[in-house]
């Protein structure tokens, strides 16, 4: 009897399924683009890899080890081999969070381990959880799907403004423009930047060891290293604005995010790109930038301005710059089309341009539009505290009621561009989420405050002469509010101080909204989103009725 029982037990063991595998502990966080959290130079900041190797080993503490082993990612087989090896290596080339199991098999059955999580990060954000927007201030849901509604988000907004990506009402936007991506270059190539204390020096730190005319990140801490909501874990490879944008895009798959290259103080290098070699370096670096930072959907060129009259008065050659602008856009478009074939992703090429008639005249925009998906018409900054005698509307649709000959208007710019042959649907009209103004305004006649002269710039929110819409709205009781029905322009005036501020109000933005629909334009965009309390973006998204719909 004992011999019989022993035989039965032996047969049961001999024909039992393999023992349950237990996966050994390991750090299973990987990154296809690795970021050096201590680096300040872009050359040392990132390393792009085609794939990562994920090793796995296991033990069986009770029972047989099996004949064959399989490694499963999310229940899909990714490796097969001899079970006796008790180890495997899996090559991974896409991002995600994977439940990994080991499955052991023999002729009598199989056993499966408990899952462990393998996290492979990439800059498409596939490893992250969606970052949802929590509705705040006056923002309310609603976005038209037949037009562009865009806004600029600035890299430095995470500091004094306290405005990270999670505060941006992204469900209400079709496009977010990230300001700004710089172009490397030192003395003589980025002199305009020296007007901002510490900014030129910061760029030199970021561009250390990197060739002139390559793009970089101006502030790596703000962009990719600063812990923020949703990307604050110690082992999260992509923190900062970029990390949040990756996660926010998962929650808003409709959103297009474009890096805006240039801007007021970062446009100097463009003036040197008539040199084909310098231009080639730039275009290739933009391609590399998009390959590294996969959450971006193209590129925005913000050259202020071809022909000059920008931040650096020493630069500008109208005829040469006009040619440079066209060939630069052509080469960027060709590069993006080539990249699109490699990635199967659609890339947009856009450009922010001046709405001043004198600057529009420099460029053949009928030719430029062939390469552009959108033209962001900066229909603001017409007037400001750089002059204490030439007071006027800093943003307006039409000429003021008191100056019918004014040519610095949105309507005049649109007519000039469409007159050149630019397709109306490519034109995106600008909204100013800030005001420009003066203090000590006096000598005006009656209530014609712009007929006076000023003592200087009005005290500003972040710089004198410039006041955020949020602040204007919060302090509205201190002012007389007026809306020029002829110009479709808003302003406020404080008689005691002589503070006069021209700005976009809900009234003027609704007027721009109607204008866009009446003229078949592409939509609206705003500078800059952190200055709004939701009022202006709501007005940009408002479904307005025009006369032919009544």
Curated annotation (Swiss-Prot):
Glycosylation sites recorded in the entry for this protein: 146, 172, 344
Organism: Orgyia pseudotsugata multicapsid polyhedrosis virus (OpMNPV)
Protein's name in the database: Probable endochitinase
Gene3D superfamilies listed in its UniProt record: 3.10.50.10, Glycosidases (3.20.20.80), Immunoglobulins (2.60.40.10)
Family of this protein: Belongs to the glycosyl hydrolase 18 family. Chitinase class II subfamily.
GH18 domain: residues covered: 147-547
Residue interval(s) of motif Prevents secretion from ER: 547-550
Pfam families registered for this protein in UniProt: ChitinaseA_N, Glyco_hydro_18
Enzyme Commission no: 3.2.1.14
CDD domains: E_set_Chitinase_N (cd02848), GH18_chitinase (cd06548)
């Amino acid at each position: 009897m004992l011999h019989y029982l022993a035989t039965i037990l032996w047969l049961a063991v001999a024909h039992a399924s393999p023992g349950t595998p237990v996966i050994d502990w390991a750090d299973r966080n990987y990154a296809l683009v690795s970021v050096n959290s201590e680096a300040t130079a872009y050359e040392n900041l990132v390393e792009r890899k085609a794939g990562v190797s994920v090793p796995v080993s296991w033990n069986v503490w009770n029972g047989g080890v099996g004949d064959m082993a399989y490694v499963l990612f999310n229940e899909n087989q990714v490796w097969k081999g001899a079970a006796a090896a008790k180890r495997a290596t899996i090559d991974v080339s896409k991002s995600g969070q994977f439940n990994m199991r080991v499955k052991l098999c023999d002729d009598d059955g199989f056993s499966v381990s408990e899952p462990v999580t393998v996290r492979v990060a990439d800059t498409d954000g596939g490893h992250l959880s969606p970052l949802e927007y929590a509705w705040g201030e006056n923002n309310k849901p609603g976005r038209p799907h037949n037009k562009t509604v865009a806004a600029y988000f600035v890299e430095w907004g995470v500091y004094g403004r306290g405005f990270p990506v999670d505060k941006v009402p992204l469900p209400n936007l079709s496009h977010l423009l990230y300001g700004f991506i710089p172009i490397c270059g030192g003395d003589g190539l980025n002199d305009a930047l020296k007007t901002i204390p510490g900014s030129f020096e910061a760029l030199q730190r970021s561009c250390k060891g990197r060739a002139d005319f390559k793009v970089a990140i101006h502030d790596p801490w703000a962009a990719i290293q600063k812990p923020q909501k949703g990307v604050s874990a110690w082992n999260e490879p992509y923190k900062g604005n970029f990390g949040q944008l990756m996660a926010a895009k998962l929650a808003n798959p409709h959103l297009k995010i474009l890096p805006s290259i240039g801007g007021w103080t970062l446009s100097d290098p463009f003036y040197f790109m008539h040199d084909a070699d310098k231009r080639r370096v730039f275009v290739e670096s933009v391609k590399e930038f998009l390959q590294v930072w996969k959450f971006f959907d193209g590129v925005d060129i913000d050259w202020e301005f071809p022909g000059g009259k920008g931040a650096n008065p020493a630069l500008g050659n109208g005829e040469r710059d006009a040619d440079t602008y066209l060939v630069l856009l052509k080469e960027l478009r060709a590069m993006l089309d080539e990249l699109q074939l490699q990635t199967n992703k659609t890339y947009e090429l856009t450009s922010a341009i001046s709405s001043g008639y004198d600057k529009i005249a420099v460029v053949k925009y009928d030719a430029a539009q062939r390469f552009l998906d959108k033209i962001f018409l900066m229909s603001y900054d017409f007037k400001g505290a750089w002059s204490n005698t030439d007071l006027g509307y800093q943003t307006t649709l039409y000429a003021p009621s008191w100056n019918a000959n004014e040519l610095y208007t949105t309507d005049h710019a649109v007519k000039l561009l469409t007159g050149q042959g630019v397709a109306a649907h490519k034109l995106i009209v600008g909204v100013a989420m800030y005001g420009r103004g003066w203090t000590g305004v006096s000598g005006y006649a009656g209530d014609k405050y712009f007929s006076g002269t000023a003592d200087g710039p009005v005290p500003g929110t972040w710089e004198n002469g410039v006041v955020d819409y949020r602040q204007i709205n919060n302090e509205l009781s201190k002012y007389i509010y007026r809306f020029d029905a002829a110009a479709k322009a808003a302003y406020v005036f404080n008689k005691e101080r002589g503070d006069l501020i021209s700005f976009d109000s809900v009234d003027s933005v609704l007027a721009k909204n109607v204008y866009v629909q009446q003229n078949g334009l592409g939509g609206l965009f705003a500078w800059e989103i952190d200055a709004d309390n939701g009022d202006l973006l709501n007005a940009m998204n408002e479904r307005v009725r025009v006369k032919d719909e009544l």
